[in-house]
């Protein structure tokens, strides 16, 4: 009897979690990447997977940084969660771009970048990562000293 009750409540719990995708998050073959602005990055490409950084709502961006690519030091007003999807991500914190001081995050890594904290990326090798946050957001380049 106890096993039957567990099975029934499990089915009800799973059924209650069912979700029908809306048109905005329906299955696609993959994101379309565009080069990041030349003033902020070289060898880096970004695609918006869901939402928009300009709206007061959740968003997810996927970034591909190529070997030798750079994303210059910058901040965002909102905290962001980073997930490394492919490769090893070289990610650093601070106002000066220093590829020797960055930390290598292997595929599967997950970490938080607090809002208004300067950070940068470097392509010691190709890597793909995702950034998720809640907008509105901005990309604020740290002035070169």
Predicted regions and their residues:
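Glycine- and acidic-residue-biased ligand/ion/polar-headgroup-sensing regions
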Residues: 66-69, 75-96
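Bacterial N-terminal signal peptides that target proteins for export
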Residues: 1-7
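Short acidic-glycine-tyrosine-enriched beta hairpin
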Residues: 68, 89, 95-116
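Conserved short histidine dyad/triad with adjacent acidic residue
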Residues: 56-76, 104-105
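Double-stranded beta-helix
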Residues: 100, 120-145
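Extracytoplasmic
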Residues: 44, 56-60, 79, 116, ...
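C-terminal motif of bacterial Sec signal peptides marking the signal peptidase cleavage site
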Residues: 14-16
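A short, N-terminal "cap"/entry segment at the start of jelly-roll beta-barrel domains
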Residues: 18-59, 102, 144-145
